[in-house]
Curated annotation (Swiss-Prot):
Superkingdom field: Bacteria
Keyword list, A-Z: Coiled coil, Cytoplasm
Protein name as annotated: Pole-localizer protein TmaR
Species for this entry: Enterobacter sp. (strain 638)
GO cellular component terms, A-Z: cytosol
Membership in a protein family: Belongs to the pole-localizer TmaR family.
Its biological purpose: Pole-localizer protein involved in the regulation of several cellular processes.
Signal peptide positions (record): none
Major localization class: cytoplasm
Encoding gene per record: tmaR
Compartments, as annotated in UniProt: Cytoplasm
Pfam families membership: DUF496
Keyword Disulfide bond part of the UniProt annotation: no
Keyword Cytoplasm set for record: yes
Classification of source organism: Bacteria, Pseudomonadati, Pseudomonadota, Gammaproteobacteria, Enterobacterales
Length: 111
């Protein structure tokens, strides 16, 4: 079975397609994030509508908003902590994989 060497144009086309695929993936993630953000805004407004009743004072409405803000800030803090924990675990796994790769590489060289 004979393997054919890809032409320079084939390599350029492959790189172009791969870069386009990555760009599309980033754009899709960006659009999905915008969708999630706007869905959250709609939900927030729905929640706010549930709490605000006719005849409420401005102070009562401001109290509700302040309470909601505190709740959301607490959630953000929790997500920041969770993200840091996940990042640490990812770094630890990367280090282990690197060590395993180095061991496999040295075993292959000694054979």
């Amino acid at each position: 079975m004979e393997t054919t060497k890809p032409s320079f144009q084939d390599v350029l086309e492959f790189v172009r397609l791969f870069r386009r695929k990555n760009k599309l993936q980033r754009e899709i993630q960006d659009v999905e994030k915008k969708i999630r953000d706007n869905q959250k805004r709609v939900l927030l407004l729905d929640n706010l509508s549930d709490y605000i009743k006719p005849g409420m004072s401005v102070e009562a409405i401001q109290g509700i908003i302040a309470s909601m803000k505190t709740d959301y800030e607490d959630r953000v803090d929790d997500y920041i902590i969770k993200n840091a924990e996940l990042s640490k675990e990812r770094r630890d796994i990367s280090k282990k994989l690197k060590v395993i790769g180095e061991i496999k590489s040295s075993e292959a060289k000694s054979e």
